[in-house]
């Protein structure tokens, strides 16, 4: 049986993706699991980090949704059921598109309905299974979910639960798009003044700073 883990902490929604190497295609700057999943497709040309099913499993592993052992189990099952794996990738991209629409529409009012709510509930409807708390080898604790039935269908459940939490807790007013138009990544603004502009100061923020410096030099 395969278990999916989530480091989301109810009430704060904080989660900690695993550190990635410099050459990793995965970037985690969204501060929320569902936003980082949206960011697996980014840029004006929409570079897709989920190129194939194995890429998706590696992303889930990097985001700490799957641990190494469980990721290996999913890969073995994908070899045995390639059609199911391919269908789950298509489904994950469909979910990602709905979550992007949610991230980009901003705060919702009582008079504005979110059309993607049906998509969220479609995935949550799969969530038959067992939830439990497990302790890692390093002593930390995680919540885990053991789905009943199709293991592929449960892969995106922790992601959609993260988005559902954001809706319930009214977090959409703090969701931003990176100010660099070439980036297109979204993030949760956890600053006190709510004025964060860049997904990451070390990349997009520094590029903007360098561009302003060049313009300043030209004007002198």
Label the predicted regions.
Residues 1-176:
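Short helix-coil boundary/hinge micro-motifs
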Residues 142-220:
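Cys/His-clustered metal-coordination modules, chiefly Zn-binding fingers
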